[in-house]
Amino acid sequence: MRRLFATAWTIWLIDFVTKAWALQSLNANPRKIIGTFLQFTLVHNSGAAFSFATGFTIAFSLLALAVVIATIYFAPKITSMGWQVAIGLLLGGVLGNLTDRIFRTPGFLSGHVIDWIQLPNWPVFNIADSAICIAAAIAFTLSMRNVPPITRVR
């Protein structure tokens, strides 16, 4: 359980710090890091990950709260190291974007998420979005390998 929460806290902290940096450094100045392949561009996103479904900010906020509550409830039961990392990445990513939705304008549960990483032909995203996607990939891999999240002790 400690691994799950350490992973979540680390992702949340990295996401928080990088968003603060993006707000400070990228306001009117997008930066080309690797030509047009990788750019840092500040975007205020009212939708879900990768700017999907804008206009449903409150619904996504409530869903994120449900994910956080469920994760905290089930966390003590997860014994697999791989699943702890996957769920920790998910929790950290969800908390990162939920922090924006709670504390950023236009207001409580409807705040815009700060996105800043841009690749060609792909929506602008952030560290939290990346963590959620990596969590999904790990969970998919663990599921395909039939790795249970909970090892039953007999």
Where are the model-predicted features located?
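Alpha-helical transmembrane bundles and membrane-interface segments of multipass inner-membrane proteins
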Residues: M1-R154
